[in-house]
């Protein structure tokens, strides 16, 4: 899946979409449809806050999201992930919101995360960013 799409989008194997498609092709449909897909910064934010919102940075750099426009539904349908389009990209967190870098996530640290980190419950958590651009 290392190719250039009709609208100039280039997908590389280290990006999330090829990995998600690989999983879809190897998992039972009833299991795949229950998955939530996160890039690492968003997963860490989820673990800290319990919120499934995603960062614009992760979605743009790793998940073929276009800021201001969202995802290209035709692209997802063409590659076999049409269910993402029909579910408003719920498995990618879009139905919960897309945040810019540093924007507050949820109500801050959950009690569990706060206890594990030795911090106060509700300590603000900002939307993350990826660690490199490739």
Listing of model-derived features with the role each one plays in the protein:
Residues 1-134:
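Glycine-rich phosphate-binding/catalytic subdomain of phosphoryl-transfer
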